[in-house]
């Protein structure tokens, strides 16, 4: 049977058109990404609360899939004039909360019974030695590390003796785990913004929605007492930083320790609370906490990938 060339050409063209039409109906693959551009990062899911202890285990597990950051406020309980005895812990917790909000971290609360340092004359003071505090805190730090919180940042505010507990804690934790933790003295950050520490205490209660815990129109009874002239002289000649540096042991009365001992009105409490909260916020902003937590991550990576393999004789 003779088939002309035109018929063959027509049939071939028709088959090609049918194939093209059929292919057009198939699902199409997405276009390839532009060379050199990474896919847009998926934002981490928001946490319901910043407080570790208020999350469910499911929420903690989910958080640890994309982050490993936890802020740990450390405080004490001691007599402090018109303020509740936990005020220095509250100040540390408020600052830790603000830092966590800045960096998508969590807060590990309730660690408020450590060495109070000065001002321990008073039955409202719970005395815990630095050694006892470290012995309590270190297992918690190690547990948090095992759980996945590799970046631990410890915060104190208001207690000059806090380094007696927290500095040895972070050092011993590093020697034992080879994981650097960070200790931030909130007082240093607050001084950089010229904060008034009494107002900071009021602001901290406001940040934590506990302002009503500060009593109104209340004047504490401070026993009349002599001045420790020897300690006063040592301080003036800068030969001793007191309990902070472990150079000389001492105790103080509330008024000597700088605690507010005059009655506070409702208007004054509200005004100081707002000013103090603003000071805490300013101190955290000035510190650039996102840079701090990234730097801690970089330091940990350098330690793990360079220092430890190269210098196996690091303290154990």
Region locations from a protein language model:
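Extended, histidine- and acidic-residue-enriched regions that form the cofactor-binding/catalytic faces
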Residues: 25-117, 122-127, 138-150, 157-316
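Juxtamembrane cytosolic interface motif at the C-terminal end of transmembrane helices
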Residues: 21-23
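Helix-loop module immediately N-terminal to the HCX5R catalytic loop
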Residues: 133
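N-terminal secretory signal peptides that target proteins for export/translocation
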Residues: 1-5
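Bacterial N-terminal signal peptides
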Residues: 10-19
């Amino acid at each position: 049977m003779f088939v002309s060339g035109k018929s063959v050409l027509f049939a071939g063209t028709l088959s090609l058109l049918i194939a093209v039409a059929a292919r057009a109906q198939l699902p199409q693959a997405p276009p390839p990404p532009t060379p050199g551009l990474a896919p847009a990062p998926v934002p981490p899911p928001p946490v319901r609360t910043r407080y570790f202890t208020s999350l469910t285990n499911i929420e903690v597990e989910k958080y640890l899939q994309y982050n490993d950051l936890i802020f740990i406020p450390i405080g004490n309980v001691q007599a402090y004039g018109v303020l509740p005895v936990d005020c220095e812990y509250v100040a540390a917790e408020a600052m830790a909360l603000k830092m966590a909000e800045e960096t998508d971290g969590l807060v590990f609360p309730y660690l408020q019974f450590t060495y109070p340092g000065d001002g321990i004359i008073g039955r409202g003071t719970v005395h815990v030695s630095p050694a006892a505090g470290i012995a309590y805190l270190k297992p918690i730090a190690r547990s948090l590390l095992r759980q996945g919180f590799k970046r631990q940042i410890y915060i104190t505010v208001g207690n000059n003796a806090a380094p007696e507990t927290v500095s040895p804690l972070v050092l011993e934790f590093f020697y034992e785990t080879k994981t650097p933790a960070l200790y931030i003295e909130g007082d240093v950050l607050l001084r950089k913004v010229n904060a008034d520490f009494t107002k900071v205490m009021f602001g901290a209660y406001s940040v934590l929605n506990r302002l009503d815990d500060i009593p109104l129109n209340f004047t504490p009874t401070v026993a009349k007492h002599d001045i420790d002239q020897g300690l006063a002289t040592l301080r003036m000649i800068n030969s001793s930083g007191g309990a902070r540096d472990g150079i000389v042991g001492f105790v103080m009365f509330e008024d000597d320790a700088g605690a507010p001992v005059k009655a506070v009105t409702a208007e004054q409490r509200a005004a100081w609370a707002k000013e103090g909260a603003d000071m805490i916020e300013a101190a955290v902003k000035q510190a650039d906490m996102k840079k701090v937590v990234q730097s801690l991550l970089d330091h940990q990576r350098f330690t793990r990938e360079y220092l430890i393999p190269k210098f196996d004789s690091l303290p154990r």
